[in-house]
Curated annotation (Swiss-Prot):
GO cellular component, one term: photosystem II
Domain of life according to the entry: Eukaryota
Residue intervals passing through the bilayer: 86-106, 120-140, 184-204, 219-239
Major place of residence: plastid
Record's protein name: Photosystem II 22 kDa protein 2, chloroplastic
Location relative to the cell: Plastid, Chloroplast thylakoid membrane
GO biological process: photosynthesis; response to blue light; response to red light
Keyword terms of this UniProt record: Chloroplast, Membrane, Photosynthesis, Photosystem II, Plastid, Repeat, Thylakoid, Transit peptide, Transmembrane, Transmembrane helix
Pfam families for this protein: Chloroa_b-bind
Induction context: Strongly induced by blue light. Triggered by red light in etiolated seedlings; this induction is reversed by far-red light.
Gene name of the record: PSBS2
Organism annotation: Oryza sativa subsp. japonica
Role, per record: Involved in high light-mediated energy-dependent nonphotochemical quenching (NPQ, qE) and thermal dissipation (TD) thus regulating energy conversion in photosystem II and protecting from photoinhibition. Also seems to regulate quantum yield of electron transport in fluctuating light conditions.
Length: 254
């Protein structure tokens, strides 16, 4: 009996050593949480930061003329070209009408003339002011003129503050030519002509031709040749599309 008991004791010890101890449910739960945290840390994905377009920051502002982009209400040179063409048509028609009828622009519209400037119609004064500001580029002259390609090079008017650039002309080269830059120049001259002829007619009661002592109220075939040439020139310049284009800040070809 004693031998049997002594043999059973080592067997129980071996059995106890070979059996793995069981952990409590709380310990297993904590181990699972740690495992989940580690898996989440390695599998989490970070979103890539959006690419920043730096081209807008480095984009140069295209300005040309006396006042530049910041000096106006947003007019581009293409807008000025349209207004100038309308002014050329209006000035040519007013000169032709005065040469035939003998009446100035305001007299043809039955507006009061021969009065002080401060007694003129407010709408008429606003129109004169708007025309003067447009003629000198104060409404905004954003953009620059780019001539059509000739060979491998292009003639580009660089932004500047010179007198000729302010009038829409190239700093170098010929003065006149049927480009959009020269159209802009002729349109501004027509705007100045309309504005000053209106101011003179308000004060003196005489039209633009009467102020220059040119005979009016005659048939078309008896109009002075130089006057007829000017009328035809403004009319042709208004309807003739010039070469080249205008480039604005947004790189749009006008």
């Amino acid at each position: 009996m004693a031998l049997q008991q002594s043999m059973a004791m080592p067997m129980m010890v071996v059995s106890d050593l070979g059996t793995a101890p069981r952990s409590s449910p709380m310990v297993q739960l904590q181990r699972m949480k740690k495992h989940l945290v580690v898996v989440a840390a390695f599998k989490s994905r970070t979103k890539a930061s959006p690419k920043v377009d730096k081209s807008n920051k480095n984009k140069s502002i295209v300005e040309d003329g006396i006042f530049g982009t910041s000096g106006g209400i947003g007019f581009t040179k293409e807008n000025e070209l349209f207004v100038g063409r309308v002014a050329m048509l209006g000035f040519a028609a007013s000169l032709l009408g005065e040469a035939v009828t003998g009446k100035g622009i305001l007299a043809q519209l039955n507006l009061e003339t021969g009065i002080p400037i401060y007694e003129a119609e407010p709408l008429l004064l606003f129109f004169i002011l708007f025309t003067l500001l447009g003629a000198i580029g104060a409404l905004g002259d954003r953009g620059r003129f780019v001539d059509d390609a000739t060979g491998l090079e292009r003639a580009v008017i660089p932004p500047g503050k010179g007198f000729r650039a302010a009038l829409g002309l190239s700093e170098g080269g010929p003065l006149f030519g049927f480009t959009k830059a020269n159209e802009l120049f002729v349109g501004r001259l027509a705007q100045l002509g309309i504005a000053f002829s209106l101011i003179g007619e308000i004060i003196t009661g005489k039209g633009a031709l009467a102020q220059l002592n040119i005979e009016t109220g005659v048939p078309i075939n008896e109009i002075e040749p130089l006057l007829l040439f000017n009328i035809l020139f403004f009319f042709f310049a208004a309807i003739n599309p010039g070469t080249g284009k205008f480039v604005t800040d947004d790189n749009d070809d006008q």
